[in-house]
């Protein structure tokens, strides 16, 4: 925490639920790290924070989606990181499955061993390589495309990045604010913090998982971290 410019505690009160960790965050704050707490209530850790963002219960995922949309709107997304270190360039067929080389008529020639000790074929994921203007296995791509996909050998595809953009489109600042109770200005500030204000360390707590949409909320927050 002490090496980050900002530390976000999202969905919990570390001072109560993880007392053994709380002092690290407070020591980092004393050393100059901004402490941000996103939680449903103003509790102990929030009282020690530089910025407290109160959010309606079970709407953490919505807040993350709204911040992602604002990042896209401003062109702040970490394009190189998304291209090189995430699944953003992978191609998805209309049936929701990844496009693989076997879909293009290239049968697997290698095998690997799965967790059950069985030999299974290696059928590589496909991306569109902008450098060669061709569909290639992910490992062979120089510059995988993140969008603008035409059908490949008659197969309609989209990148994961395009699907993320589509998923966050409804989450305008106003709609996100209405759902979460977080002000438009705070949503904008959160998006700016994650992308324009230096290193951010996020400590996502178990509070998000206390609702039946907890898994999806966690995935939305993780997506915010990847996009930024």
What are these regions (language model features)?
Residues 27-35:
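A short helix->loop->beta-strand "cap" motif at the edges of active sites that frequently abuts
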Residues 185, 194-228:
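A glycine-rich, hydrophobic/aromatic-adjacent loop/helix-cap motif
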Residues 1-7:
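Glycine-rich oxoanion-binding loops at beta->alpha junctions
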Residues 14-23:
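Glycine/threonine-rich flexible loop motifs
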Residues 46-47, 51-197:
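Long, well-ordered, tryptophan-enriched scaffold segments
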Residues 7-15, 112, 173:
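The substrate-binding groove and active-site-proximal loops of carbohydrate-active enzymes
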Residues 38-44:
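Short, polar loop motifs at secondary-structure junctions
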